[in-house]
A protein has these predicted regions:
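Short, acidic, metal-binding catalytic loop of nucleotide-sugar glycosyltransferases
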Residues: 2-4, 12, 16, 22-36
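Cell-envelope/extracellular polymer assembly enzymes that use nucleotide-activated donors
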Residues: 5-8, 38, 145
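Active-site-proximal specificity loops/subdomain of glycosyltransferases
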Residues: 21-24, 33-70, 105-106
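Short beta-strand-to-loop acidic/aromatic patch adjacent to the donor-nucleotide binding site
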Residues: 68-83
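Conserved donor-nucleotide/metal-binding helix-loop-beta segment in metal-dependent transferases, i.e.
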Residues: 83-107
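A recurrent flexible, glycine/aromatic-enriched loop bordering the glycosyltransferase active site
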Residues: 103-121, 128
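A conserved catalytic-core signature of glycosyltransferases
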Residues: 114-122, 133-134, 140-141
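C-terminal catalytic/acceptor-binding lobe
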Residues: 135-138, 144-227
Length: 227
């Protein structure tokens, strides 16, 4: 039997310790006998609106540095727990949307082009398409923006319609002004998908904080601060 593959989970994060504990426990159970899990927790410092896309980009760069550019990765919200049948480590396309059956949406997609929740890919593919735009602050729009870039790139994309996730309850902070700015940026991206900045660590400092490796799971934490 060959060595188990490495899988990197990239978690955009702030003030969700209880969810992170549940997620880590589930991934440890889910991975047994199938793959070696590496969880990259990209924690945004307090002070600025949350930037999920930028945090995921920063995590991609860390996986690329530590595990290599062809490592399977999951761009993964911390509040989504996978069913045992979810497959993270075998990718039939450059981008595979996994969160198609999520409990909070009654196991349906909330809209036709939904590309949120959990996406499996590799650092190489993310860097090739330019990653998420770096300019989506606050809630909403960055997943749709990534899908625009994937479609424009010519790389392959698939959806798996039998991958189930349980979503954990949480409060979402929505800033109406930022939401409208994000919608305006998304409309500009429909004309030019590369508006809004490509994957980069420019404008951020990223510092590794106390992490954990115990032979079964690797959990690496990084404090990400806008500059």
């Amino acid at each position: 039997m060959g060595a188990k593959p490495e899988v990197g989970f990239i978690i955009p994060f702030r003030n969700r310790e209880a969810h992170l504990a549940q997620f880590t426990k589930r991934i440890l159970e889910h991975s047994r006998g199938k793959y070696n899990p590496w969880i990259f927790v990209m924690e945004q410092a307090e002070g600025e609106p949350f930037n999920r896309g930028a945090l995921l980009n920063l995590g991609v760069l860390q996986v690329n540095r530590i595990l290599g550019d062809n490592t399977p990765i999951a761009l993964h919200d911390v509040d989504m727990l996978p069913a045992p049948s979810v497959n993270y480590h075998q990718l039939e396309a450059d981008f595979v949307h996994l969160a198609t059956c999520v409990s909070q949406f009654k196991n349906k997609m909330p809209y036709q082009d939904y590309f949120g929740g959990v996406v499996a890919t590799t650092p190489r593919s993310m860097i090739s398409v330019g990653g998420f735009p770096m300019d989506f602050w606050g809630w909403g729009g960055e997943d749709d923006a990534l899908l625009l870039r994937v479609k424009a790139s010519g790389l392959s994309m698939r959806r798996r319609y039998n991958q189930y996730f349980v979503s954990l309850a949480h409060e979402r902070e929505i800033d109406g002004d930022l939401l409208w700015k994000n919608r305006d940026l998304l409309e500009k991206m429909r004309r030019d998908p590369y508006t809004g900045g490509r994957i980069s660590n420019e404008g951020w400092t990223v510092d590794q904080t106390p992490s954990m490796r115990d032979g079964q799971i690797s959990l690496l934490r990084f404090l990400c601060t806008p500059t």
